Amino acid sequence: MDKQEKNGKYILGIDQGGTKTAAAVMREDGFIVGCATTKGAYFPNEGVENALEQMAAAAEGAVNNAGIGKEEIAYTVAGVGGIDWTGDDMMIRDALRERLSLGEIFACNDAVIAFYSGALRSHGAVICAGTGMNGALIDKNGRQFVYGDYMEEKAQGGSALAK
């Protein structure tokens, strides 16, 4: 992609789980122009600071790989494992805004992002079994219900399912 195609309206997506943190920069038409991956961090166990450090590194890598400046990011969406309780989303959003110096940020549990990435309709449910396990249900009115952090870690995730 050459520099003339850039219109200053990019979306930054961040996906953080226990194994990895991935970030992608895309144009408004969905074409991905830059990606980066760093270590994972589950903030309820490893701390918010560590999670933010990994998200910032992945985001900055994706922006650099896209060949744009942070000021060209119009909107950021972060799907973060561990956003399970009321207020977690706002806490992560505010911390990301401060760390990355970006404006519009939406943060939610990564299962919500997983649901919308494959949904054929606006409501339904998804279960995600990665390093950990969580799920989300979105009802016909758009209300989100997240299930996560209710089980012992050794009893959840893909490795527990394989036992």
Where are these regions (language model features)?
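Short beta-strand scaffold segments in enzyme catalytic cores
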Residues: 21-26, 116, 127, 133-138
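Conserved phosphate-binding catalytic cores of ATP/NTP-utilizing and phosphoryl-transfer enzymes
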Residues: 1-7, 102-126
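Short beta-strand-loop/turn "lid" adjacent to the catalytic site in phosphate-handling enzymes
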Residues: 59, 63-99, 118-119
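Glycine/GP-enriched mid-protein hinge/lid loop-to-helix segment characteristic of carbohydrate kinases
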Residues: 47, 123, 134-163
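Residues on a specific face of well-ordered alpha-helices
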Residues: 53, 57, 94, 113, ...
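Active-site phosphate-binding/coordination module
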Residues: 94-99, 128, 138, 143
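Short glycine-rich, Thr/Ser-proximal phosphate-binding strand/loop in the N-terminal lobe
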Residues: 7-53, 57, 143-145, 150-151
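Short glycine-aspartate micro-motif
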Residues: 11-15, 73-77, 124-128
